């Protein structure tokens, strides 16, 4: 009799455990429906989240333009976040190298992080060479076409080389740096960017002005 009682007690406890698991699952997953919406966050910030994806050769002026835009947005009381090689390669992508597979994973992670910022209502700028259409399309698919604006910093190769204080282009031409974009690795120029900026002829202030206009922000 004791063994039968123990058996049925075990069954009852197991049933109770399974029911509690079901309740926990029902309580866990719907939490996303109760979180603040993107619209709530954008309303709080008084701005709309958007992705500005800067692409171009090394030395084209991606980071320089991005920083100038960030300062202008900050001056206007708008929240902006820049993602570039310095803060990404030293952090969440520190374990990645420069193989084709790692380059793709690098862009994928950047896009996923960018999407989180955009969904929070933050004006997000990614400044990466991202040399192929495939990589930029990967980022656009993750972030969403509506929020993704491709900005081509189209400064010519000769000017990028002239600006290169680190001598990376010279090393690449001597064969000391392998797979260097623009020299020993190709760069696929965007065919239909939202905006194209050649910093060799367009002053920095004018670049910022054009970006503000693209964002629908009054000069």
What residue ranges belong to the model's regions?
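The conserved Walker
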Residues: 58
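Small-molecule kinase domains that catalyze NTP-dependent phosphoryl transfer to phosphate-bearing small molecules
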Residues: 154-210, 217-218
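Conserved substrate/cofactor phosphate-moiety recognition/catalytic segment
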Residues: 67-112
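Conserved lysine of the Walker
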Residues: 62
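Extreme N-terminal, non-catalytic leader segments
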Residues: 17, 21-51
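ATP-dependent NMP and nucleoside kinases share a basic, alpha-helical "lid"
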Residues: 91-98, 114-172, 179
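Hydrophobic anchor at the beta1->P-loop junction of P-loop NTPases
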Residues: 54
